[in-house]
Amino acid sequence: MKIAVLFCFFLLIIFQTDFGKNEEIPRKQRRKIYHRRLRKSSTSHKHRSNRQLGIQQTTVFTPVARLPIVNFDYSMEEKFESFSSFPGVESSYNVLPGKKGHCLVKGITMYNKAVWSPEPCTTCLCSDGRVLCDETMCHPQRCPQTVIPEGECCPVCSATVSYSLLSGIALNDRNEFSGDSSEQREPTNLLHKQLPPPQVGMDRIVRKEALQSEEDEEVKEEDTEQKRETPESRNQGQLYSEGDSRGGDRKQRPGEERRLAHQQQRQGREEEEDEEEEGEEGEEDEEDEEDPVRGDMFRMPSRSPLPAPPRGTLRLPSGCSLSYRTISCINAMLTQIPPLTAPQITSLELTGNSIASIPDEAFNGLPNLERLDLSKNNITSSGIGPKAFKLLKKLMRLNMDGNNLIQIPSQLPSTLEELKVNENNLQAIDEESLSDLNQLVTLELEGNNLSEANVNPLAFKPLKSLAYLRLGKNKFRIIPQGLPGSIEELYLENNQIEEITEICFNHTRKINVIVLRYNKIEENRIAPLAWINQENLESIDLSYNKLYHVPSYLPKSLLHLVLLGNQIERIPGYVFGHMEPGLEYLYLSFNKLADDGMDRVSFYGAYHSLRELFLDHNDLKSIPPGIQEMKALHFLRLNNNKIRNILPEEICNAEEDDDSNLEHLHLENNYIKIREIPSYTFSCIRSYSSIVLKPQNIK
């Protein structure tokens, strides 16, 4: 019996010893374990959020696609309608040659499929010459307080960082948020130092609460130990304390000694925690510096969102408004350029005022202007100071349409990419007028008094990057000489051009579009070698000239040929036979084509490639031969002719079982008796709704 009792007592001692050792694990180690768990949980949460974000971004919605917009807090709130769901549009007579389908928006030419945002709430797309715009759809917020950030239209929670944070940063500091450089500059560091992230403060609070709870538990343990003491030990302690007090050597009790020791340990722990926090912050800063931002995107804040800086006040004249970085004073009845001091402004609109002069100091307070619109004013050449634009080192777009200029302003910034001086009274362009504009891409000089007599052949030589030149509504009789080799699109409509010589396009090997409508060109005044060797020329518009035949010696690379409103009576045989890959769009509306003006070889070389053929408003009495052999044809106009009968095999080939690619067939306003058309005449066309037969003329 005694052996069993001793054995149990021995086991009890071993158990208490092990339990005490487990309780005496250093608190510093426990804190490290606790912080390690916090880090693991935070990283796992980040991974989960990243996975969720990736899933949301790759999800495809049908039938209407939506493009999610990811905010700075990695939430997805705003959604835009996709432009891919817009239906196709039938061709019209207002054809812009070239496959690109450009759009003209506020005087700016947008290429096909270009996407831009004219306002913070709107996104637009150029689709085959049409401008399609969508407004942002804002999802409701479930937070108690919402705010609409500057430059945006959807409300966000007040604790969510907005784009206005970036709007308060100067343009020169924008690179710190992009992927162009892995080094961060001082403004970013200052931004983080001035507003410490809340997550660090939360970690400190959690640590202090954990330490406080540990100390409370220790105090409770001490109280329970004191309560467990026997009365004898209490009496002994009282006698001991009384003896000490009588002797004058007052000593502290064991509980007080423990408390003092705990206080010292607590101070040591706090010092160690401060050192650990400083080390952790240093490690986090190093991790932030080592984490490069890739891609052309804004850098996201590494911690919690930062509040937006206060907006500064800017005094504007009556009738003017401020939108993000644009000051708009359209039709504000201004007589002079207002004195403004706003380095953050990048766009200034002064359209439709009565401004007559531009002094040298007009834009001193707007050094970062990128776009300046001075159209529809009364500005004269003598009223522009010689240094008016000299300080605008970042100016890229200048619009001076609809003024009273007689010459191009001098000392324009070399950063200009677009210059518009349409509808003025320009009398000449000399060799120095466009000097130093080697970055200019677009030049528009329509509606002036320019001709080959007052335009120096060397005037366009400095324009090494020029791709888009508009010289319509002037007085040219020949193609201007000295065009730069970089030119891609040339517009010379509404002039008095009579001929096209062999040397006109000798140095313009990149030219893609030539528009010469509303001139006086005859087919025998087009030199055989004028453009036949052009390898990139795809679109030619010779509408409303004096052509009697489809011109020969057309470029091999031609895809679009627009010949509306001439007096064409015949399409010569094999005129398209040399083209590669082949003509795709041929517009011959409003001419004088008759049945004897076309035969089967007239379209030789284009049977495999022709997609649109316009033969409306002519003198045809029957379906032209070879239509059923045009396998790629999608759009055929034969309306407003004199057609009376449609033979069964003129549209569909009875020997072939495949459906035709025809999507639009116009036969209205002829003399066809619809009831007499055989039922299988249009059997190869997939949908009868694609055929327009009504109304018909009665005679």
Swiss-Prot record:
Keywords noted in UniProt: Extracellular matrix, Glycoprotein, Leucine-rich repeat, Repeat, Secreted, Signal
Residue span(s) of domain VWFC: 101-158
Chain ranges of the LRRNT domain: 307-344
Chain segments carrying region Disordered: 176-316
LRR repeats: 368-388, 394-415, 416-436, 439-459, 465-484, 486-507, 510-530, 536-557, 558-578, 582-602, 609-630, 632-653, 661-684
Tissues showing expression: Expressed predominantly in adipose tissue as well as female-specific organs such as mammary gland, ovary, and uterus.
GO CC list: extracellular matrix; extracellular region; interstitial matrix
GO biological process, one term: positive regulation of cell-substrate adhesion
SMART domains: LRR_BAC, LRR_TYP, VWC
Predominant subcellular localization, coarse grouping: secreted
Membership in a protein family: Belongs to the small leucine-rich proteoglycan (SLRP) family. SLRP class I subfamily.
Subunit structure: Interacts with numerous extracellular matrix proteins. Interacts with MSL1 and RASSF1.
Record's protein name: Extracellular matrix protein 2
Organism: Homo sapiens (Human)
Gene for this chain: ECM2
